[in-house]
Amino acid sequence: MAVLEILSIPDPRLKVKAEKVTDVSTIQTLIDDMLETLYATGNGIGLASTQVGRKEAVVVIDISDERNDPLILVNPEVVSGENKALGQEGCLSVPEYYADVERYTSVVVSALDRDGNPITIESDEFLAIVMQHEIDHLSGNLFIDYLSPLKQKMAMKKVKKYVKAQAK
């Protein structure tokens, strides 16, 4: 297993649309590496393959306090959603920036698990928000894309400052 580099805005690879996985046996190492990368962040709760420069439609999520209950979603899709509300979001690809985003508070998501079995997840909790955020990444969308141009500029400025400070 390996810790992968997490891309930051404005990297154009974050805008790439993921491709459906046709054979889950080909992504087992990717899943393991994505989980290791997620856990290495210390505070991340979700990671999409496009955030590590990969094109396969894979999402890993772990919202457990102990960080030992991963949810693997292959080819995930939001089938339905209800009741929109504003909630604060952040992103590993937009470090140190948080903003309110409107999302469904209740969703149904269909996907494959890491073994290729079809799964359906219904959630009206925090997981619903996290799944939407990560699935957006697979479409080449970031949470800041929902913000005004001014707030997008502010996010870019903050991330550039953060990346510059990390490079020192």
Curated annotation (Swiss-Prot):
SUPFAM superfamilies: Peptide deformylase
N-terminal signal peptide: none
Keyword annotations of the record: Hydrolase, Iron, Metal-binding, Protein biosynthesis
Annotated residues for binding of Fe cation: C91, H133, H137
Gene3D superfamilies: Peptide deformylase (3.90.45.10)
Enzyme superclass (EC): hydrolase
Active-site positions on this chain: E134
Cofactors named for this entry: Fe(2+)
Cofactor binding summary note: Binds 1 Fe(2+) ion.
Catalytic activity reported: N-terminal N-formyl-L-methionyl-[peptide] + H2O = N-terminal L-methionyl-[peptide] + formate
Regions annotated as coiled coil: none
Stored NCBIfam families: pept_deformyl (TIGR00079), PRK00150.1-3 (NF001159)
Functional summary from the UniProt entry: Removes the formyl group from the N-terminal Met of newly synthesized proteins. Requires at least a dipeptide for an efficient rate of reaction. N-terminal L-methionine is a prerequisite for activity but the enzyme has broad specificity at other positions.
Name of the protein in its database record: Peptide deformylase 2
